[in-house]
Amino acid sequence: MDARRKHWKDNTFTPFLNEHDFQEAAAPPQPLSEQSSADNHKRMGRVSNFSVRNTQEGNKFKRKDYSSQIAEGEQDSNLRERRMNVSKNDANTNSAFWDSLHLDDATKESSHRRESASAWNKKKLPAATQVTRKKWTEAMPPKLRLHLLNEELGELSLKCREIERDFENAEKELLNFRKEASVKAVNFQEPGTGASKKDRELQALKNDLSEKATNVKNLTEELQQAKEVMYRLSLENRNLKDAVRKLKHQTELNTALLREEMKLFYELEMEKIRLELGAIKNELRVEKTLRVKNSRALEVLGRHVASVVRSSNPADHFTGNIF
């Protein structure tokens, strides 16, 4: 596991110097034939590295160790064959170069199509889902929308923290790999067959460095997008909180006004009832007074009638008294 991790770190970033820089500075001038053969070797090595790099672009990161070992074995065998057959490699150089160019063009075209398709999906699909979600959430009550936005804000906060943590780890790894690459560049002076191996390692480090830089850039963009979404959701959350606070205040005002109206209505009704009760009491009092007056008048009238009857019929009284 440690050896694999070390190899992965070695294949992650490239130094700024390679073995050719040291050899070109220290080597004496070569004859024309030896220089042409060396140029052919160098060109074939670059073409082979170029083709291997293009074929390895679509692989996953976990399979880089195995593919780099296979590429090293193939390139070692190619170097031995080129040293034995220098004249034959001169004729095969052009064909390998054009094949690698065609392969590079096809790989770039396919990767460009994949990137364009993925970019369209990333741009169109989130926009459509965002519009649908917005229409769906606008029909909700404010409290439910506030609850959902709080949950989404918490999830985005966790995601943002994870992205920041990954970004910090990637920056730390980048710094460590650059230090290791610089140390390897200073100590990188092995002659012979080790030169081609170091060239391949340098190329792999360059490829991994570009990939790491792309990953860091993507993480930075995702972090920025997450921050923008969090800012937008925080604004919506604040607006919803303001709306809920206003609705609560309005509800309290309406409740207070309703209580005041009910109190006034109760007082008015009680006043009306008291007035009606007083009027009824007055009527009863007047009725009692009239009844007393009528009873007295009837009594006086009865006495008067009785006296009149007695005075108008004395014989009847006399006869009645006799009998």
UniProtKB/Swiss-Prot annotation:
Residues 48-58 have a biased composition (Polar residues). Disulfide bonds: none annotated. Residues 144-289 form a coiled coil. Residues 1-81 are annotated as: Disordered. Keywords: Coiled coil. It comes from the Eukaryota. Belongs to the CCDC160 family. This is Coiled-coil domain-containing protein 160.
